[in-house]
């Protein structure tokens, strides 16, 4: 079994303070003219822990290259796949892996796309990966079907959010607590038994706000896997938020928000590919030897965010969070014919040279049974 527990210390985000320099009388010049220091008023810039941009206006006026996918855009297309959402963003390259966006491979500005390991992936400003330099898509990737907005920063402009100054950062903003009572249900059904349902309930009273969300995303899969054709998946997401806040017109405004999240996934996904000949004739086929491959994950998150708004243009956002992740990917790793060490072949060796390893390929595809054969699975943590 594989466990990842991550406790990260408190992060602080400070807005710039409006500075007004008092004009001071300078010495007079030879013409008797009085010179004064120029006075410049700076616009306030507020950076919250849960958002990098917050609007398309901020994205356009942000130093560096930034893009903001608004709630209106996400609602218009209704995508459940992050790969489709990010296709509208310039400088983003993506290649598919499972066809559903469960483990996306995202590249910003030509960085390595595999497992999105060269960019910072965040939800509400908190890293989704177990560590800054880990491959987040290989472990946990937030379910974008419940997201409110998507923010993208490319290049060194995202340095305050992570170490990948060449690539950038992608921040997924979760649904905020509504100002008035809201309840909704959204359901869709498509080919291959693909089903997606999202329900939410929330409100904000005088000093207390809350939100509860549930998302179920599943599919039977589009690949053919004889004899049982188990190539699908299901995912569950439950999120709860509770916020305590002062009056909007208070001299010093404050808010404290608690976020609790739980998600799990069960995927009949496999590392086993196809030989070149089989891929050309039936690209969506899966060998019988891979029918036991299975991925299981669990993820929990606790985040506490405090906001204090002082007079004079200073705002401080403090976030303390804890992430826990567990996964195990049971996958076919080798095919064995006999008891000797030399009678074992890896999947890579078999598919790279199927003619030389024809006996092993027959066992992998289920074409023949041999005495002493074994399909050897590995718990890939």
Where are these regions (language model features)?
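Short acidic/polar hinge/loop motifs at secondary-structure boundaries
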Residues: 126-154, 240
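N-terminal periplasmic "start-of-domain" segments of outer-membrane beta-barrel proteins
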Residues: 39-77, 102-105
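Extracytoplasmic beta-strand/coil segments of soluble accessory domains associated
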Residues: 58, 83-130
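Flexible, solvent-exposed coil segments and beta strand-coil junctions
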Residues: 88, 174-182, 214-224, 277-287, ...
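N-terminal periplasmic accessory domains that precede
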Residues: 82-85, 104-110, 119-122, 137-143, ...
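Transmembrane beta-barrel wall of Gram-negative outer-membrane proteins
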Residues: 182, 189-219, 226-270, 294-310
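Outer-membrane beta-barrel pore domains and translocons
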Residues: 50, 155, 173, 186-190, ...
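Acidic/polar loop-and-plug regions of large Gram-negative outer-membrane beta-barrel proteins
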Residues: 243, 252-305, 328-381
């Amino acid at each position: 079994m594989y466990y990842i527990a991550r406790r990260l210390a408190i992060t602080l985000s400070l807005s710039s303070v409006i500075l007004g320099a008092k004009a001071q009388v300078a010495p007079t010049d030879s013409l008797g003219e009085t010179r004064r220091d120029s006075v410049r008023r700076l616009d306030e810039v507020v950076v919250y822990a849960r958002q990098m941009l917050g609007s398309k206006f901020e994205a356009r006026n942000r130093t560096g290259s930034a893009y903001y996918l608004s709630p209106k855009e996400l609602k218009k297309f209704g995508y459940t796949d992050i790969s489709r959402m990010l296709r509208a963003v310039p400088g983003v390259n993506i290649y598919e892996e499972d066809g559903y966006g469960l483990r996306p491979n995202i590249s910003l500005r030509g960085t390595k796309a595999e497992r999105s390991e060269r960019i910072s992936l965040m939800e509400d400003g908190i890293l989704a990966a177990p560590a800054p330099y880990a491959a987040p898509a290989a472990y946990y990737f937030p379910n974008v079907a419940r997201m409110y907005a998507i923010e993208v920063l490319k290049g060194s402009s995202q340095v305050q959010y992570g170490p990948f100054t060449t690539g950038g950062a992608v921040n997924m903003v979760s649904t905020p607590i509504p100002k008035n009572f809201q309840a909704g249900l959204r359901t869709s059904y498509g080919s291959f038994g693909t089903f997606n349902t999202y329900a939410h309930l929330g409100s904000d009273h005088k000093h207390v706000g809350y939100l509860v969300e549930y998302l179920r995303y599943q599919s039977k899969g589009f690949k053919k896997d004889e004899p049982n054709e188990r190539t699908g998946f299901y995912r569950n997401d439950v999120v709860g938020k509770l916020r305590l806040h002062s009056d909007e017109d208070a001299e010093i405004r404050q808010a404290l928000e608690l976020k609790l999240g739980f998600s799990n996934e069960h995927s009949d996904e496999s590392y086993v590919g196809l030989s070149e000949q089989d891929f050309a004739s039936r690209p969506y086929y899966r060998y019988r030897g891979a029918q036991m491959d299975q991925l299981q994950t669990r993820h929990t998150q606790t985040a506490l965010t405090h906001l204090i708004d002082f007079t004079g243009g200073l705002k401080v956002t403090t976030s303390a969070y804890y992430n826990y992740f567990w996964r195990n990917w049971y996958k076919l790793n080798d095919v064995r014919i006999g008891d000797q060490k030399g009678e074992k072949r890896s999947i890579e060796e078999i598919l790279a040279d199927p003619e030389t390893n024809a006996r092993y390929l027959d066992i992998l595809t289920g074409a023949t049974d041999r005495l002493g054969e074994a399909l050897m699975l590995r718990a890939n943590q």
